[in-house]
């Protein structure tokens, strides 16, 4: 007689589901932003290469992975509607294991952040608090289509950039670094808005007021494209003012290519979002590194 093992719920997580829980595909943006921060300082790492590598691990697998675990746990009811095959609603990570994993990774993130010095630790504390504030009740900032994507954009692009610069320079980043990092974080609000399209139906049912829910897919997509373009136009303008016309020209070319991709996106926002994430967003983050090289060595004159 055969036994249907699916009738018996798991007591421990499925190993593959653990990797799905922390979503490695999401680690690239903060790692890339962290590297942009290290480049923008204009200092050769030298003996600090271990700090650079440790910061990459912290920004990606640890803090970003922890935020994904926390979000998956807090979103398990929404995911049961949107994506029932995800690790927690499918039962592959049973009981409260998702919560325990998120808490363990929180502690581990803080411990590693402590090793990066006061600036690295401070940024880690901010990132950890932001991750929980985004997902957990009663705060749950992701319910807002404005605050939620804004917080994620700041933690995915601005905070890692700031951290990479601060860790390598062992001090507060310059005005130029902070300004460019904040502008790219502002533009990333549009990227995060596009990311909300995949959860449109579940967000409607569970009261998550994402911009696609509040404004409709067409208007939300236009707003996202406007925000992304505005941020890059401001960066281009500043680079010209700061005497970096070649770098400004490269970012302009990348923006023009994005505008063509945006035209395709706006024809079918919900259907073309995955495509745009692989094309337009890639061009956006390439511009980040160009800007990082542009501001290397810039100093405020007395």
From Swiss-Prot:
Membrane topology: Multi-pass membrane protein
GO cellular component: plasma membrane
Pathway the protein acts in: Porphyrin-containing compound metabolism; bacteriochlorophyll biosynthesis (light-independent)
General function of this protein: Catalyzes the esterification of bacteriochlorophyllide a by geranylgeraniol-PPi.
CDD domains found in the cross-reference section: PT_UbiA_chlorophyll (cd13958)
The protein, known as: Bacteriochlorophyll synthase 33 kDa chain
Gene designation per UniProt: bchG
UniProt keyword Transmembrane helix present: yes
NCBIfam families tied to this protein: chlor_syn_BchG, PRK07566.1
Keyword Cell membrane: yes
Keywords: Bacteriochlorophyll biosynthesis, Cell membrane, Chlorophyll biosynthesis, Membrane, Photosynthesis, Transmembrane, Transmembrane helix
UniProt-annotated location(s): Cell membrane
One Pfam family this sequence matches: UbiA
Membrane-spanning parts: 25-45, 49-69, 97-117, 119-139, 145-165, 166-186, 223-243, 246-266, 275-295
GO terms for biological process, alphabetical: light-independent bacteriochlorophyll biosynthetic process; photosynthesis
Organism per entry: Cereibacter sphaeroides (strain ATCC 17023 / DSM 158 / JCM 6121 / CCUG 31486 / LMG 2827 / NBRC 12203 / NCIMB 8253 / ATH 2.4.1.)
Recorded GO MF terms: transferase activity, transferring alkyl or aryl (other than methyl) groups
Chief location of this protein within or outside the cell: membrane
């Amino acid at each position: 007689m055969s036994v249907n093992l699916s009738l018996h719920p798991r007591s421990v997580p499925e190993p593959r589901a653990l990797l799905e829980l922390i979503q490695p595909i999401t680690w690239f943006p903060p790692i890339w932003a962290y590297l942009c921060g290290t480049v923008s300082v204009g200092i050769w790492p030298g003996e600090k290469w271990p700090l650079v590598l440790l910061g990459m691990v912290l920004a990606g697998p640890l803090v970003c992975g922890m935020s994904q675990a926390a979000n998956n746990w807090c979103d398990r009811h929404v995911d049961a509607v949107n994506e029932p095959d995800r690790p927690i609603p499918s039962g592959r990570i049973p009981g409260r294991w998702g919560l325990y994993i998120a808490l363990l990774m929180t502690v581990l993130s803080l411990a590693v952040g402590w090793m990066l010095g006061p600036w690295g630790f401070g940024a880690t504390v901010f990132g950890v608090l932001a991750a929980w504030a985004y997902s957990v009740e009663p705060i749950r900032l992701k319910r807002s289509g404005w605050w939620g994507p804004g917080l994620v954009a700041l933690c995915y692009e601005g905070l890692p950039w700031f951290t990479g610069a601060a860790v390598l320079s062992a001090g507060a980043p310059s005005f130029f670094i902070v300004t460019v990092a904040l502008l790219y974080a502002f533009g990333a609000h549009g990227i995060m808005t596009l990311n909300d399209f995949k959860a449109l139906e579940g967000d409607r049912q569970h009261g998550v007021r994402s911009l696609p829910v509040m404004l409709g897919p067409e208007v939300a997509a236009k707003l996202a494209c406007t925000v992304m373009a505005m941020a890059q136009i401001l960066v281009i303008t500043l680079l010209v003012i700061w005497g970096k016309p070649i770098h400004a020209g490269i970012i302009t070319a990348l923006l023009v290519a994005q505008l063509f991709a945006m035209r395709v996106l706006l024809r079918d926002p919900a259907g073309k979002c995955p495509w745009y994430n692989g094309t337009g967003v890639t061009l956006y983050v390439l511009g980040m590194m160009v800007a990082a090289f542009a501001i290397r060595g810039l100093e405020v004159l007395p």
